[in-house]
């Protein structure tokens, strides 16, 4: 009979996604992103200057931080203070890499964009939701710079989105919830541009290997999700 999704979705169906722009007052871009029961607050701040290794080159930079609120999961987690977990460091590097691929830093000038992705509620897919929502916040921050006359042209060169795909009973399923994530034998996070160029693949098997054919199926399903996510980004940004 195969895997039956707890929420009744089809195998290629995303969870409902929404972007609430202007969520906080002071960030240049601020978006509360909801993907099913997962909620991530994505803020982008603009700072003058760049890291030392870029000084004098006329180029900009983007960096990202990722955290989870203690009550974002059913069991309260301790706040990460001075020492970040390996998972947190991995995720914030992923967010930064993914969003840097969206930008032409020569057009940004010597300023740094700081992305803060804070998970308010987690039901799997927090890193993919953070990337997809932070792109919308990034677009709003760039628009603010353009409106203020600080930039002459937009440095955004690619739309970027991310989605999870998992194998459950040997079949690929898009955008896993937590209940599905823990049951999946293979779990992938896929980051792509609007033209479906791959920016990152993170895939692991839990106890079972998977074939090249199944990998191709996973990527096919991911492309379906990326197209829909970027369409949602464009819709909310009025593109």
Curated annotation (Swiss-Prot):
CDD domains on file: RNase_PH_bact
Entry annotated with the keyword RNA-binding: yes
Source species, domain of life: Bacteria
Name of a matching Pfam family: RNase_PH_C
This protein's record includes keyword Cell inner membrane: no
Gene3D superfamilies, per database record: GHMP Kinase, N-terminal domain
Catalysed reaction, written as an equation: tRNA(n+1) + phosphate = tRNA(n) + a ribonucleoside 5'-diphosphate
Positions bound to phosphate: 87, 125-127
Disulfide-bond pairs as recorded: none
A molecular-function term among this protein's GO annotations: 3'-5'-RNA exonuclease activity
EC number(s) reported in the record: 2.7.7.56
Alphabetized InterPro entries for the sequence: ExoRNase_PH_dom1, ExoRNase_PH_dom2, ExoRNase_PH_dom2_sf, PNPase/RNase_PH_dom_sf, Ribosomal_Su5_D2-typ_SF, RNase_PH, RNase_PH_bac-type, RNase_PH_CS
Sorted UniProt keywords: Nucleotidyltransferase, RNA-binding, rRNA processing, Transferase, tRNA processing, tRNA-binding
Top-level enzyme category: transferase
GO biological process: rRNA catabolic process; rRNA processing; tRNA processing
Role: Phosphorolytic 3'-5' exoribonuclease that plays an important role in tRNA 3'-end maturation. Removes nucleotide residues following the 3'-CCA terminus of tRNAs; can also add nucleotides to the ends of RNA molecules by using nucleoside diphosphates as substrates, but this may not be physiologically important. Probably plays a role in initiation of 16S rRNA degradation (leading to ribosome degradation) during starvation.
Similarity section: Belongs to the RNase PH family.
NCBIfam families according to UniProt: RNasePH (TIGR01966)
Subunit (UniProt): Homohexameric ring arranged as a trimer of dimers.
UniProt protein name: Ribonuclease PH
Organism of origin: Cyanothece sp. (strain PCC 7425 / ATCC 29141)
């Amino acid at each position: 009979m195969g895997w039956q999704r707890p929420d009744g979705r089809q195998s290629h169906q995303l969870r409902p996604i929404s972007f609430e722009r202007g969520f906080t007052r002071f960030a240049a871009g601020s978006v509360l992103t909801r993907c099913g029961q997962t909620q991530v607050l994505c803020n982008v701040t603009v700072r003058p200057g760049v890291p030392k290794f870029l000084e004098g080159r006329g180029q900009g930079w983007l960096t990202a931080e990722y955290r989870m609120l203690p009550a974002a999961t059913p069991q309260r987690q301790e706040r990460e203070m001075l020492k970040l977990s390996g998972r947190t460091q991995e995720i914030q590097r992923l967010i930064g890499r993914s969003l840097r691929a969206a930008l032409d830093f020569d057009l940004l000038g010597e300023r740094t964009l700081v992305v803060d992705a804070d998970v308010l509620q987690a039901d799997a897919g927090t890193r993919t939701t953070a990337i997809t929502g932070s792109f919308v916040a990034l677009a709003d921050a760039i628009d603010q710079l353009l409106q203020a006359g600080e930039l002459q042209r937009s440095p955004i060169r690619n739309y970027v989105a991310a989605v999870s795909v998992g194998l459950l009973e040997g079949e690929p399923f898009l955008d896993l919830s937590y209940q599905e994530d823990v049951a999946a034998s293979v779990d992938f996070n896929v980051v792509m541009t609007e033209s479906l160029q791959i920016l990152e693949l993170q895939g692991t098997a839990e106890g079972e290997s998977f074939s090249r054919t199944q990998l191709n199926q996973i990527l096919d399903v991911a492309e379906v999700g990326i197209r829909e996510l970027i369409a949602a980004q464009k819709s909310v940004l009025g593109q």
